Amino acid sequence: MERKYQNEIHCNEIVLLAYYIADVNIESVFHDITHRKTYLPYSGICLTDTFQLAEKKHNELFTEFFQDNSKRVKKQMATHVRVIVGNPPYSIGQKSANDNAQNLSYPYLDKRVSETYAVKSSATLNKSLYDSYVKAFRWASDRIPQNEGGIVAFISNGAWIDGAGQDGMRRCFEDEFTSIYVLNLRGNQRTSGELSRKEGGKIFGSGSRTPITITFLVKNPAKKGQKAVIHYHDIGDYLTREQKLKMVKDFRSISSQKLEWQIITSNDKADWINQRDGCLLYTSDAADDRISVD
């Protein structure tokens, strides 16, 4: 545990307050688990923009003033990372430049989204693919070793699971990974009436209106070339936030017997849930069928 704590656990934060909170939390968990009598500081946290590290011409943050931080960033970039865990922000539609997740420019990462998720999408409007949480999935998918495999585990905006504009994203997940686990926590409050009540409590409280998913993307090099097996679990209807969180806590693991995974086979439109059957065809000719009243 001490070896992993000191050498194998890395953390990035760009907001100073969040940086210190994350540092304290990691140190607290380590000391609670190990029951050490002497304090051992955590040295794996970096004050940096994770997405900026993917850019070919990235700038080392505050190199002159924070040399230790710069060394940590260099060490992390040289490290083989096989498991990435996070809660990425989402930023499309932010109301002002003062919002927490500002829409910064990441040319290389945007290019990667364009040549993967956007290329494989049949949607004509791809704005939603440039949301920060989508970029996080793209960055993490590229960051894990392509030949050795790894795991990406995110709790994120869940709009991608059935969004028409994210069909290319779902196609890429199937092509790039071998196993996919999606726990749909629902909570979509961009709805109204009975549908809103069915969606249940908002996972992140009053500040959240989007649906939330916990997603595990597994890349197993032994199964290279095979389409991913998609495991899906819907948390259920009419549940409060507290009920949902208790259920997640009780699950403990994706191998839990309490989790009844449904195996999904996507259709040719890359629908995973709420699949279209393709039987209905609507044309403008329907407007010609009129009933005349004399």
Question: Predicted segment positions?
Answer:
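E2/UBC-UEV (E2-variant) core
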Residues: 110-124, 239-272
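A short acidic, often aromatic-flanked loop/helix-cap motif at beta-alpha or helix-coil junctions
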Residues: 51-55, 188-192, 238-242, 269-271
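SAM-dependent methyltransferase catalytic region
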Residues: 1-182
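Flexible, glycine-/basic-rich loop-and-beta segments that form/coincide
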Residues: 202-251
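Single conserved hydrophobic/aromatic residue that forms the stacking wall/gate
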Residues: 282-294
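Substrate-binding/catalytic lobe of Class I Rossmann-like enzymes that use SAM or dcSAM, i.e.
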Residues: 154-158, 196-199, 213, 219
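Class I S-adenosyl-L-methionine
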Residues: 181-214
